[in-house]
A protein has these predicted regions:
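Short glycine/acidic-enriched loop and turn motifs that connect beta-strands
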Residues: 11-14, 59-64, 113-116, 170-172, ...
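Short loop/turn segments immediately following beta-strands, especially the blade-tip
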Residues: 21-28, 73-80, 120-129, 177-183, ...
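A short beta-strand motif characteristic of beta-propeller blades
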Residues: 31-37, 83-88, 132, 139-145, ...
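Blade-loop segments of beta-propeller domains
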Residues: 32-104
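Beta-rich, blade/repeat-based domains predominating
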Residues: 39-50, 91-103, 138-160, 192-207, ...
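Asp-box/WD-like beta-propeller blade repeats and closely related beta-sheet repeat scaffolds
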Residues: 81-153
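Loop-centered beta-sheet repeat module
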Residues: 162-218
């Protein structure tokens, strides 16, 4: 079987925008890197059920001033590179994350450098209009990466349809109610310890927990989640790196197996994927730490049948493929030399 994945990238050295790769599950290999569309630093990509592709980007005017937003492409087409259906550039710089609400026809962005979360309405013809914009607030963390303001790093839906926003700068996780018109209504805030540096979060509705990656602290936290009230609370915290690791590291992406039994976190610096088992209550235990066979693994993803994991190494421009044991959750590297320029994110194409 051939599975296709969309790849977000930086375009600071050799990348030109968004790419696509194929996973050949029968022959157990990555293949056919294809250029999808041109954009400046399209680090994260989202796709709707209508197969519209939304990619973060930014533009520069004649004076060199930058505005950020995203571009929309028709993902049903294979006429690469794709031509934009629509685009919007109304933010101070390019966002850090993008997600889609299928039911309400909305797009969400988290803008790390501007300190804002934004919602947009998407019309039937693909046209885009702003629905809401909120500036994160809170006490800045003590680490140098937190000293210049709030830094929203992630926004998406919770399992019950609220919105969660994760802020690295103020060490907070925000929960919002979402109105039909795209307006965000504050519900609750979780204050993490100073310097935790929240980056990404994953909810397990069955276990009533969420797993929160701390980029700056190289941790993953288990949070209890009351979906009726929209309230998170801290249970415990686990390190993603070895105890004797003294060099720089930033925890990055988190993925959870479909059966909820295993949690995976990438480490940029230690250049590894940490593998945790998760019991019936969501408690974590470290069971493996495996090299990504490259430098700075920002993201990775599991295949449809959960038998493979694909990791992207940004600085070394390569993707690494692993087989995954569904019983133990452990990974085995089988390919490490597949070229992906400045890879940042990987999304299964619909």
């Amino acid at each position: 079987m051939i599975e296709k994945y969309l790849l977000g990238t930086y375009t600071r050295r050799i990348s030109k925008g968004v790419y696509q790769l194929e996973l050949d599950t029968e022959n157990q290999k990555l293949q056919n890197l294809t250029f999808v569309g041109s954009a400046i630093d399209p680090t994260y990509v989202a796709e709707s059920n209508q197969k519209r592709i939304y990619a973060i980007t930014k533009v520069k005017d004649d004076k060199g001033d930058v505005t950020g937003g995203f571009v929309e492409w028709d993902g049903t087409s294979d006429d690469f590179p794709l031509k934009p259906i629509a685009s919007v550039h109304d933010q101070e710089t390019s966002p850090a994350y993008i997600a889609v609400d299928e039911d309400k026809r909305l797009v969400f962005t988290a803008n790390y450098h501007a300190g804002t979360v934004n919602t947009y309405r998407i019309a039937d013809d693909g046209s885009i209009s702003k629905a809401d914009r909120i500036m994160d607030k809170g006490t800045l963390g003590f680490r140098k990466e937190q000293q210049d303001g709030p830094h929203p790093h992630y926004i998406n839906l919770t399992p019950e349809g609220r919105v969660v926003a994760v802020d690295l700068g103020v060490d907070k996780v925000f929960i919002y109610d979402l109105e039909a018109n795209g307006k965000l209504v504050p519900v609750s805030e979780l204050q993490m310890q100073d310097g935790y540096g929240p980056r990404h979060i994953y909810f397990d509705a069955k276990k009533k927990v969420a797993y929160l990656v701390g980029e700056l602290s190289s941790n993953v936290a288990v949070l209890d989640y009351d979906a009726d009230k929209g309230v998170l609370s801290l249970r415990d915290i686990h390190s993603t790196i070895p105890d004797d690791w003294t060099e720089h590291n930033g925890a990055a992406a988190i993925r959870v197996s479909k059966d909820g039994r295993f949690v995976y976190v990438s480490n940029r610096g230690n250049n590894s994927i940490a593998v945790f088992s998760s019991d019936e209550s969501g408690n974590l235990s470290l069971i493996q730490r495996i090299s990504t066979e490259g430098d700075f693994p920002r993201d990775f993803n599991l295949s449809d049948d959960q038998s493979f994991v694909i990791a992207l190494n940004q600085n070394s421009d390569n993707a690494t493929l692993y087989t995954r044991d569904p019983e133990s959750g452990k990974l085995t590297m089988i390919q490490k030399d597949f070229t992906v320029p400045e890879g940042v994110s990987i999304l299964r194409k619909k």
